[in-house]
Amino acid sequence: MIDYERVSKFISLVLRHKPEAANLTVDKYGYAQVDELVAYLNKKYGGFTVTDLDTIVETDDKQRYSYNNDHTKIRAVQGHSFPVDLGLEAQQPPLLLFHGTSTKYLDSIMEKGIISKSRQYVHLSKDVDTAHTVGLRHGGGTVILVVNAEQMRKDGYKFFLSDNGVWLVDEVPTKYFTLYHCNTGFDLNLLKVIAGEYDDFFVHHERTEGQS
């Protein structure tokens, strides 16, 4: 029986970082040929078919992959370490966005801001829970960086929304975020309240200004 989780991790590696690991070439939009990928996976894992690939794409909890219109090509929807034209247009982000990380990275983040490192973009979450889940993956104390996306937008930064709901931006300088340690459930719930009240305040403020 094919281990879909294991295969999915390999597909992620290939489509995001190392297409040559599966003898693939990708076009400027990040797409690889489905038949070539399936042929390689069949050789590597045995008995792998297009149906198996469909299952992985459809059941992936992060929705990391997408097909082109006729399902002849496949790509990762974000997270590339090489330049890819995702065909995304700049969008207006929520007032706040969130970035989950670990305390072990804080010194670098406070010096350089949130940078993409090996990825094409910085990845930001639309809600606290998702950012917290991302932060937990790094181990150590979990920190959520609360990003003032609205101010960044006003200052000219462009935000893009990937097909799986991840917000993308080139960088986040230190002046646009604050730190919040989330070591307990209470910390996490308190941050949700604070973030919600921030949104409510600005929505109310904008409505009041519009009525004056």
Regions flagged by a language model, labelled:
Residues M1-L97, S102-V122, K126-S212:
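Conserved NAD+-utilizing ADP-ribose enzyme module
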